């Protein structure tokens, strides 16, 4: 990495955002914070902005702006405060910004991620919805505007590192030459050994108790259901131009092998490392060079053994639903994601049983298939279908 980079961290108070700021702080000679954004943890945003000397912060509304100013250290000049969703997209495209960490969870992060791609930025993509809900649209924007796309999910980042170097960050339209298949690994979450019949009474706290990773509550539930892995299958399809029949999922409880690439000659390349998101984040920030991340060395002798197994689709029906949606097309993927967000929100707030998350998604996919054909040629088209699916899922009487 030869040039100095000013980074916008969108979703800075989440786990990815916090880890990103940790890595940036380790390399003041190469990286600086341009902008930060948060939705609800405004006091933490003020702490981050003060510590990182951010030039800009983005908050959702006027009330959040007042909260930010109230939390700002007395006697210090505050950063520029921008307000609203359009301000978020404008900040992602700002000429003063070189790199955008797109780490806002959910469909709310899609417009800003797309704006960054359209502005030709280096996009560090941690927001799944940009590809799950708008894969074709997003990849076209990357190609048309000369943006760089570096996946930050540990699995996709691992695959990226194991692929041939040519064109990896430029939204390829064909699978990399010589690659037979992609193998995504999954921890299996907290219920890997549970009988499916015992999952009916699962509580939100149980679902959020991930054995290996420290994550937010929504993504922790997605990991427990393996819908998260299903979304990653869809992402891998778009990131690496790989058809679904050449993408496989394996449960790997130790979360040491982050994913693998199998080549036509039978070789399998894997990326291993500690389960710490600072590794893929530092890779994205430093690409094509490598930066120190603060992650300790991997002691394979301590691990002793690494296990792999095929996922049980009776225990993880959401994974099968994701493959079904990918084969059905982009509209089904939009419906899958929207229905899951509604269902997980209902589960976390105590309005839906854990085992009904997959039922809400399945019902939404059936509903989407009954609709007249839709075109998803613009962000407005995607967001309209997203909203319609949310309304349908919310009216099921299940959420």
Swiss-Prot record:
Key words, A-Z: Isoprene biosynthesis, Manganese, Metal-binding, NADP, Oxidoreductase
Annotated positions binding NADPH: 13-16, 127, 129, 216
Positions annotated to bind 1-deoxy-D-xylulose 5-phosphate: 128, 154-155, 187, 210, 223, 228-229, 232
Annotated binding of Mn(2+), by residue: 153, 155, 232
Broad enzyme group: oxidoreductase
SUPFAM superfamilies: 1-deoxy-D-xylulose-5-phosphate reductoisomerase, C-terminal domain (SSF69055), Glyceraldehyde-3-phosphate dehydrogenase-like, C-terminal domain (SSF55347), NAD(P)-binding Rossmann-fold domains (SSF51735)
Catalytic activity, EC: 1.1.1.267
Gene3D superfamilies given in the database record: 1.10.1740.10, NAD(P)-binding Rossmann-like Domain
PANTHER family referenced in this protein's UniProt entry, alphabetically: 1-DEOXY-D-XYLULOSE 5-PHOSPHATE REDUCTOISOMERASE, 1-DEOXY-D-XYLULOSE 5-PHOSPHATE REDUCTOISOMERASE, CHLOROPLASTIC
Function: Catalyzes the NADPH-dependent rearrangement and reduction of 1-deoxy-D-xylulose-5-phosphate (DXP) to 2-C-methyl-D-erythritol 4-phosphate (MEP).
Family (UniProt): Belongs to the DXR family.
HAMAP family, per database record: DXP_reductoisom
Protein name per Swiss-Prot or TrEMBL: 1-deoxy-D-xylulose 5-phosphate reductoisomerase
Gene responsible for this protein: dxr
